[in-house]
Amino acid sequence: MVRVARSVNARKKRRSILAAAKGYRGQRSRLYRKAKEQVLRSLVYAYRDRRKRKSSFRKLWIIRINAAARMEGVTYNRFLQGLKLANIELDRRSLAHLAVHNPDTFSALVGVAKDSLKNAPDPVAAPRLRGTSSRT
């Protein structure tokens, strides 16, 4: 029976793992087993955080829009409501960009939102009877 020579493949695999672990601290960049564990964990973190990054940026955009809107005297919620009433469909990313880089344009949008809030009809709430719920 012929032996299977795998030294080339094994060396290539080890070299690729150690190359991926380059820059890690201590044994994690030098010892194969430790490096392999850390590289696998790093790939898990990378996968998870690619999804997490989307919500992190959305939170950042909302914070920036809220801060800029409050400087103009309106809250984030009322500002977006006013934009919706004015049929202005800008996403949070572009609104945050305008708030940071083009404050004049953003304040014009705030003015439009305020005007549409003033001119909007008040929503009339239906009177609720005591003891009844809206769920059926």
Swiss-Prot record:
Protein name: Large ribosomal subunit protein bL20
Cystine pairs: none
UniProt GO MF annotations: rRNA binding; structural constituent of ribosome
Keyword Ribosomal protein: yes
GO terms for biological process, alphabetical: ribosomal large subunit assembly; translation
Source organism, top-level taxon: Bacteria
Encoding gene (name): rplT
Keyword presence, ATP-binding: no
A GO cellular-component term linked to this record: ribonucleoprotein complex
Matching SUPFAM superfamilies: Ribosomal protein L20 (SSF74731)
Family to which this protein belongs: Belongs to the bacterial ribosomal protein bL20 family.
Functional note: Binds directly to 23S ribosomal RNA and is necessary for the in vitro assembly process of the 50S ribosomal subunit. It is not involved in the protein synthesizing functions of that subunit.
Swiss-Prot/TrEMBL keywords: Ribonucleoprotein, Ribosomal protein, RNA-binding, rRNA-binding
Organism lineage: Bacteria, Bacillati, Actinomycetota, Actinomycetes, Micrococcales
